[in-house]
Amino acid sequence: MVPRDWWLEPWEKAAILEFHAGHLTEGYRRMAFMMLDADVVAASPSSVYRVLRDAGSIKAHKTRPSKKGTGFQQPLAAHRHWHVDISYINVAGTFFYLCSLLDGYSRFIVHWELRESMTEAEVETIIQRARERFAGERPRIISDNGPQFIAKDFKDFIRICEMTHVRTSSYYPQSNGKIERWHKTLKGECIRVKTPLSREDARRLITEFVAHYNEVRLHGAIGYVAPADRLAGRDREILAERDRKLDAARQRRKAAREASRPAG
């Protein structure tokens, strides 16, 4: 069998397995781009998958394609859509309200607050603080039909701020799935894992997780770049650099195999 340029060398396979051992909670796709960005191994997600599968470190499985957001017109730039949602956070048996705002284009967490109550006026305050962080932006606010968002005062607030507001259908909430997914990720990877013992502890943990989520964690829905990079417009440069690294690795493997062939 003739070796292909994308076939990994033994040291590359070993490096993948070693990296995986230190990142067991990461999926193979995210891990492939993490290694690529960190100059550990330049390998495609499919190559990483095969290495892990052959080593018995991953199981083949089929996932059903999600219909979340099907038919929903996605924003083409940052700060066009801000998704807002309220979720409950269980802290040592006491439930607090978490309100988050997420930029629909970059998945960047624009602002969040953890409170004992969450009235319509408090939601206004949270959105206003988010607007102060990004002065001059007038995003479309996307929410569910919670009581805070259907109140007349909230409608007046949106009008005064010269924004627009869209509420998801009661029978089709998928267009707000981005923020719902964020809350699910936060609870699954932070709150339930680290079990905060007080509201102050929860705020500290959420602050740390949001920083990691925005600045470091690679997001699959935006090409496995960090939300902050997408927000700042650095994603194209990152993707181009990855392509360059993958091509250079293929050329290096090809040259190494040609050099190892017996002279004839």
Regions found by a protein language model. Name each.
Residues 36, 50-53, 159, 211, ...:
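Residue-level detection of the helix-turn-helix DNA-binding "recognition helix"
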Residues 2, 161, 185-264:
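C-terminal domain-tail junction helix/linker
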Residues 16, 31, 48, 85, ...:
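Mobile genetic element proteins and their domesticated derivatives, centered on retroelements
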Residues 6-7, 143-145, 151-158, 165-188, ...:
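RNase H-like two-metal-ion nuclease catalytic core shared by retroviral integrases
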Residues 20, 35, 39, 169, ...:
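Short amphipathic alpha-helical interaction patches enriched in hydrophobic/aromatic residues
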Residues 11, 41-42, 46, 50-102, ...:
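Mobile-element integrase/transposase regions
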Residues 1-81, 173, 231-235, 240:
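Basic, flexible linker segments flanking DNA-binding modules
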Residues 112-113:
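Short hydrophobic alpha-helix segments
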